[in-house]
Amino acid sequence: MGDWSFLGNILEEVNEHSTVIGRVWLTVLFIFRILILGTAAEFVWGDEQSDFVCNTQQPGCENVCYDEAFPISHIRLWVLQIIFVSTPSLMYVGHAVHHVRMEEKRKDREAEELCQQSRSNGGERVPIAPDQASIRKSSSSSKGTKKFRLEGTLLRTYVCHIIFKTLFEVGFIVGHYFLYGFRILPLYRCSRWPCPNVVDCFVSRPTEKTIFILFMLSVAFVSLFLNIMEMSHLGMKGIRSAFKRPAEQPLGEIAEKSLHSIAVSSIQKAKGYQLLEEEKIVSHYFPLTEVGMVETSPLSAKPFSQFEEKIGTGPLADMSRGYQETLPSYAQVGAQEVEREEQPVEEAVEPEVGEKKQEAEKVAPEGQETVAVPDGEKVETPGVGKDDEKEELQAEKVTKQGLSAEKAPTLCPELTTDDNRPLSRLSKASSRARSDDLTI
């Protein structure tokens, strides 16, 4: 049958570039087809034409009947089947080898570029990226174990070669059925020219040949089943990868873009950052001012959250306008109130002074001369004495206490209390001196 070593060496290369099911298919091809076909089938079909005997003496009738019974030898048919079924695998191996060589050239080119970069940097070590490190590892592993992944055009070529193998298997099984059927009969009747009549021909080893035919057909069906299984395996794998990509790609993007997003977000916050509604700060609302808040109850009685806002909850830019205004201090408010209250007090004091002057003139006894006293000074008579002084001092105290009570802020209740302390000696002496000056 010839030497199968050449085809075997090529198919070994296919084993290195196939899936698990593809390797099983190659095992079936080598052991159950090539090995059995090269060892046992030749001995069974070795005497095929010589042992084909017909009951006629007509020259050429036996050869014509054999050609009609066996248009092609089973062994040659199976050899053609092996060749045709292996051809797509050979095409795939050629493409895989080309792909591997191109990858090796690309990796060598990248390694040269890295060397040139390191030389251009003055001998400094350039930090190796993870992709480049993986490329180096994969290149070393590909040289050692020749492992790779089915992706891209290589995967398409692999799927196409499985489809063609399946088609060839089905075609040869159907052709075998139409040519021979699934069994060999011991008696074959032939009526072909130049036979004078119907001739009976006898086949040697019909049972053994039938067993071999059934065995080879079963191996063909097993190979067909493995092809279908491999197609379904690749299909399920593609579906799983398609379902996993939407879940895995966002994670990969987040992992790659996390550092970039952090840097960009920090720059944007530095330029301008607006607080969200839930991030509003309310600790700067003061209950004593009437700009932003109005106190509904004492500060110690209720928490700060119970203050009601006068201004609607709008953007913080509107709220900040109220706090930019300058608020009047306690001193300014007190000064304004004093200015308002001084005018009616002065008007009330002037008529009181005039009445006191008239009373002093009436009370003065006859024979004494009245002296004109300038405004603002007290007039005392010798007849009145110390009682009038006490009454005037008490009136002055009352007026002073009223003014102080009106001018003092409401927040200090201690200042509004009456002062019942006695007058000092100096104040009494000054009042006596004034009364002595007024008397004549």
UniProtKB/Swiss-Prot annotation:
Enumerate the subcellular locations listed in this protein's record, separating them with semicolons.
Cell membrane; Cell junction, Gap junction
Q: Tell me, which GO biological process terms does this entry list?
A: camera-type eye development; cell-cell signaling; gap junction-mediated intercellular transport; lens development in camera-type eye; regulation of granulocyte macrophage colony-stimulating factor production
Kindly report every residue range on the membrane side named Extracellular.
Answer: 43-71, 183-210
Q: Name the domain of life this protein comes from.
A: Eukaryota
* Cytoplasmic topological domain residue ranges: 13-21, 93-161, 232-440
Its membrane topology is listed as: Multi-pass membrane protein
Has the keyword Cell membrane been applied to this entry?
Answer: yes
Which chain positions lie within coiled-coil regions? none
Q: What would you give as a GO molecular function for this chain, any one?
A: identical protein binding
Q: Which residues lie within the membrane without crossing it?
A: 2-12
On tissue specificity, the annotation reads: Detected in eye lens (at protein level).
Instruction: Write out the similarity annotation.
Output: Belongs to the connexin family. Alpha-type (group II) subfamily.
Q: What does this protein do?
A: Structural component of eye lens gap junctions. Gap junctions are dodecameric channels that connect the cytoplasm of adjoining cells. They are formed by the docking of two hexameric hemichannels, one from each cell membrane. Small molecules and ions diffuse from one cell to a neighboring cell via the central pore.
Protein's UniProt name? Gap junction alpha-8 protein
Organism listed in the record: Rattus norvegicus (Rat)
Question: Gene encoding this polypeptide?
Answer: Gja8
